[in-house]
Amino acid sequence: LLTHTYTGYPMVKEARHRVLNGDLGKIRRIYVEYPQGWLYNDCAATNKQAAWRVDPKRSGKAGCMGDIGTHAFNLAEYITGLKATEICGELQTFVPDRLLDDDGAALIRYEGGARGVLMASQIAVGCENSLKIRVFGEKGGLEWRQEEPNTLILRWPDRPAEIVRTNNGYVSGISAYNSRVPA
């Protein structure tokens, strides 16, 4: 069982609303990245969580992409409403003797012609939980970062960027409904 918790954030719901409402126009590009640095070395002997995550007998056949890449992939499909039709991926293991991938990237083709790039890494030294997505359409773009979850940035060709904050009068009903921050 896998829970995709990032789709529950109010500003993720706001991003989805803006895309599905057509605010960005037809989606052209999706960039989603999920760098973490906690597995940058061979820490399995001293870290219980690392020990099971890098052991295919306990965690399964997928390493980094199965652990965190799936969240990035889900976030892109959720926000845009687009399904991936083709994926060209590369998995890499940088830490010597590690049995599972600890880094990966993918080029993604989505229905409707949109293209995407996904990066997931657990050897990105200095990064904690840096999930970030940028979506670009014909009329505008957006950016959301998990490390600053109450902020959504909207970008336009003809006016300044907008910073949308959780539970304000200008957010969509679905975003406001999912907010637990006092107004």
Report each predicted region and the residues it spans:
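Residues that form or immediately flank small-molecule/cofactor binding pockets and catalytic motifs
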Residues: 35-37, 57, 91-94, 123, ...
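Alpha/beta-hydrolase-fold catalytic nucleophile elbow
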Residues: 3, 33, 136
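C-terminal glycine/acidic-rich active-site capping loop/insertion
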Residues: 49, 53, 78, 105, ...
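Short catalytic-loop micro-motif centered on adjacent basic/acidic residues
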Residues: 1-4, 119
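Structured beta->alpha junctions
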Residues: 4-7, 124
